[in-house]
């Protein structure tokens, strides 16, 4: 199957590299940052001038872009070249309602559409060990599963279009609240003479053990906020969650608290940093 990949950011570049290395047929790529394209061309990908060219040449079009408006722009650009022979997979984390709208647009051309957002961050993307939540038909899911397996090892069909994104938003909302609990309690421990690594070791033996702390303790200890998943991206996701909760008539006070931390982090200019940098917001807060 000829594959097209649009969006070679922090995650997309690593995901696409695994496809290029494992797929027997051509892989066509496009990104507005030429350096990203050049990196994949060195691996064997074929550069395209725009998204339209990718979609025209590929059987399966994959997009991995930052926001809803970017997914919408790509779909609008490629619609004229979609047909029943093609399948469109948006792996971006966007508003589920927008994704459902885009799926309807794509399906009118005869092409199939699935949302397939990913969980975990850059190291897992590089290793081909992402989790992937899929929304779409069972037939479409089975068709794309071999390609998704190039990028991930825990791949679950959640239901119809949009359901993959709903699960992704629920996942990231939970991570944001676990993270905020780690931030608050580790800051309290530090205020009372217990460093982050000692705190993390102690937590690992009890019910509070969690993947976030296990994976980020050294970065926090070293104040190394090199980005694997940015504050800006999680800020987007927590607000998608709150919008979804509002539509669902569900109160989520824990997520509202996490959103306030992310809002403050964005105001302080931390947006490009890794999301573990939210610790800087929490540890500097004073009681009301």
Where are these predicted regions, by residue range?
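NAD(P)+-binding Rossmann beta1-loop-alpha1 motif at the extreme N-terminus of oxidoreductases
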Residues: 1-62, 82, 86, 122
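Rossmann-fold dinucleotide-binding core
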Residues: 3, 94-173
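Hydrophobic beta-strand scaffold residues
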Residues: 27, 47, 113-114, 155, ...
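Residues in the short beta-alpha loop(s) of Rossmann-like NAD(P)-binding domains
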Residues: 32-33, 67, 137
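Rossmann-fold NAD(P) dinucleotide-binding segment
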Residues: 51-112
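Helical "substrate-binding/catalytic lid" subdomain
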Residues: 163-288
